[in-house]
């Protein structure tokens, strides 16, 4: 597999609408402040703070979109976790790996909706996901409804929007490949 596999327009129109509507309806509930622990040379240390929404109990995410991930990637997965990441200006993520075990993958689905992030505005909004691969930093634009699949041991971080009053949303799937 290539290091990163990108899927533009991952969800069809109705699925994207339903997903965006879910976050719009639940904006004022369900987002909890969260500080991830990140691995450093001296052990685990607190990373930067951002927002997190548990999605594992929602069938839209834990079943329907998971099946779409499997269909589009031609892989079968066990779902380890799924949650929403939320970031506002100043909440850049820390460099980290999600899982160092063999056969684990992360799938990110960008779902920022106010505004929709697309090719005409991404350069002023920011919110890239940075990947450190073979000594290079590769930034992936967080276009709304774009999916990115990568092995969970790749060092990466989510960058916050450059402008205030924008809430960058990505859905993070933690997956174990079934072989």
How should each PLM-predicted stretch be described?
Residues 52, 63-179:
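Catalytic core of non-heme Fe(II) oxygenases with the double-stranded beta-helix
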Residues 1-76:
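Non-heme Fe(II)/2-oxoglutarate
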